[in-house]
Curated annotation (Swiss-Prot):
GO terms for cellular component: cytoplasm; cytosol; intracellular membrane-bounded organelle; nucleoplasm. Changing D96N: Increases PGD2 synthesis. Loss of activation by calcium or magnesium ions. Glutathione binds at Y8, R14, W39, G49, K50, I51, Q63, S64. Prostaglandin PGD2 synthesis is stimulated by calcium and magnesium ions. One calcium or magnesium ion is bound between the subunits of the homodimer. The interactions with the protein are for the most part mediated via water molecules. Magnesium increases the affinity for glutathione, while calcium has no effect on the affinity for glutathione. Residues 81-199 form the GST C-terminal domain. The gene is HPGDS. Changing D97N: Reduces PGD2 synthesis by 99%. Loss of activation by calcium or magnesium ions. Residues 2-79 form the GST N-terminal domain. It comes from Homo sapiens. It catalyses: prostaglandin H2 = prostaglandin D2; RX + glutathione = an S-substituted glutathione + a halide anion + H(+); 2-glyceryl-prostaglandin H2 = 2-glyceryl-prostaglandin D2. The keyword Nucleotide-binding does not apply. This is Hematopoietic prostaglandin D synthase.
Length: 199
């Protein structure tokens, strides 16, 4: 088994999907969390100046979704067929496109709040409806078993609900999917013991 070291801030953020995958696959790793004050010094040492990074036996991987695909490759989390794998990637990318619209690093609080409000008020409802329609009456987003797309939905929606608690009031099927992911023993155990952070 390779030695894994995950480096990210002390928050869920873009590293949480990697942590869920490690938990589900029962893979041991070092969860190295850095403070904002240490970031400038660390940033200058990274090939692309961004985290999370995953060190695998000393070799550095970057980009959270690329890391997630690397870890889930040849596992049931990736999807059971090539077509399912494409659908998994499409749902993950759809969610990530939306999450990337938010000005997470904006320093002007009034500008940040206005943009968040617009996205949550006008854009989020359309995405929730699209996801609800896509899920339909199925148990999971893709195929007949859980994939990392379901994990990513739970992670992204947890963050969105911090800012818009009524986000899923009209989408009980999406709420049920969240609860199903949270009830998976390995995921439930991780959620229970992880550091509690806002984001």
């Amino acid at each position: 088994m390779p030695n894994y070291k995950l480096t990210y801030f002390n928050m869920r953020g873009r590293a949480e999907i990697i942590r869920y995958i490690f938990a589900y696959l029962d893979i041991q790793y070092e969860d190295h969390r850095i403070e904002q004050a240490d970031w400038p010094e660390i940033k200058s040492t990274l090939p692309f100046g961004k985290i999370p990074i995953l060190e695998v036996d000393g070799l550095t991987l970057h980009q959270s979704l690329a890391i997630a695909r690397y870890l889930t490759k040849n596992t049931d989390l990736a999807g059971n067929t090539e077509m399912e794998q494409c659908h998994v990637d499409a749902i993950v990318d759809t969610l990530d496109d939306f999450m990337s619209c938010f000005p997470w690093a904006e320093k002007k609080q009034d500008v940040k709040e206005q943009m968040f409000n617009e996205l949550l008020t006008y854009n989020a409802p359309h995405l929730m409806q699209d996801l609800d329609t896509y899920l339909g009456g199925r148990e999971w987003l893709i195929g007949n078993s859980v994939t990392w797309a379901d994990f990513y939905w739970e992670i992204c929606s947890t963050t969105l609900l911090v800012f818009k608690p009524d986000l899923l009031d009209n989408h009980p099927r999406l709420v049920t999917l969240r609860k199903k992911v949270q009830a998976i023993p390995a995921v439930a155990n991780w959620i229970k013991r992880r550091p509690q952070t806002k984001l």
